[in-house]
Amino acid sequence: MSALRQNDRWRWLTAGAVAVCLLAFTLLIGLLGWQGVRAFWPQPVDQYQFQPPQGAPLMVLGETLDRQQQGDRWRYVVKTGNRDFAAPDFRVIVSQGEAQTRRPAEALVLQRRSGGNAYGWLVELREDNEVLTARDRDALLQQRLKQVHEQLRQASNIRRIEMARLNAQLESLQQQADEQRRGGHFSLQDQSELDANSAALHKRFGALAQQLAHLQHESQRDTLVLRDVQGDDHLIPLAQVVAAWYPNSLSLGQKIGHFLSQIWQFVSDSPTSGGSENGALPAIFGTVLMVLLMSVIVMPLGVVAAVWLHEYAGRNALTRLVRIAVVNLAGVPSIVYGVFGLGFFIWLIGGTLDQLFFSRSLPNPTFGTPGLLWAALTLALLTLPVVIVATEEGLSRIPDNLRQGSLALGATQAETLWRVVLPLAVPAMLTGLILAVARAAGETAPLMLVGVVKMVPELPVDAVFPYLHLDRKFMHLGFQIYDLAFQSPNIDADRPLVYATALLLVAIILSLNLLAMVLRHRLRER
């Protein structure tokens, strides 16, 4: 009877621990979700008239973040925006008595590429300083915004794809010519061919430059005049505006549509203002690409090491020592792996590769500098113990009778391993992959040493051969969270983006893990 009571105590204890873990995870997701939604949901804009304890009345327009009564005084925290002409964009105001408040339906919010939001009233739209007239100025504003965004998109494609491809061809021609000169095989005919090819490429580049300049000029023609709460007018180019809306006059359906469009803009656009505003596409792309490349590297190494330890290595002191070393590697701080990756992969291996295969680019390093390949290798080394242990656990659960039966039927040990043992161990391998992805996607400290940066001019994948550039630096959601939370000059404005980026990172990790779990379940059914 006492044994049953003891078991009941342990059962309740374990059930309580599971409940606490689930509650903590739910609260974490709830906090990230609630705070992250605030970054995209259109907040109402209030117009206040404050009466400070001393001084003249104060007019303020913005989003109300907090309001507290302190005796006969009221304390307000208002996001007033307009950072470039009415800094700061967050204000704490103490009013003598409750402030007079109203929500003007015509109040306009502008999400800009830099400088934060702008709040005010639309006075007029201009094209080349000529005032545009229309019955519905809001519809005209949205139409002009779409037109400007399309021009900016075309200009970006020319700059990132077509001009980048021509630049790569010009650099390749110049490097080939320099290599021939160093080898003493550069003739007058080679020089004439080089001049002809370079002239043709420069001609195409000049045509693209003219087209790019035309698009940039067209995108700068449209401007709007915004009147702030103090009555001052400000000229804002539409090329600097990401989105414009009237939050106080939106219906529920319009708010949902705006919310979805803001989420899409966040996950599909590039960041501006040093990475502290607008989109997170490069960070999403870099995170997923790095995790996939790490998985491709770590899975073969981990599976081969586990198979050797369990199937081929004898039970001796050396094997026990290797297992102890593998298990202890999982406890090494991640920053140590970053230092190892910097010293071994980048300086030693990368520097050697540059001298052997990319000497014509020296002293500019190609692989002797932090990049995507070294980040993936470093995290593969970091997660290797997890894959080895999980795979070896799966191999140990396979009955020896299956191995012995296969050998008795005439199969070799290699055939038994390939046709009997490994198919049964695939779910365990995928379990190791799930654990490796979960850890690698959230690592930040080692990546700061081996390849991640705050902003990148180009993605590791583009239209220039060889299309996947393993030597390029990349952005990562974990580092972006750190940068927004601790390195931003305006943390109050970036706080919602911190929560939104953290929620996005959790969603990506859960999606990758769910994909691996579905694959494991299907293989298990087979």
Where are these regions (language model features)?
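Transmembrane-helix boundary motif in ABC transporter permease subunits
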Residues: 294-326, 339, 347, 516-525
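Membrane-topology segments of multi-pass transport proteins
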Residues: 1-15, 22-275
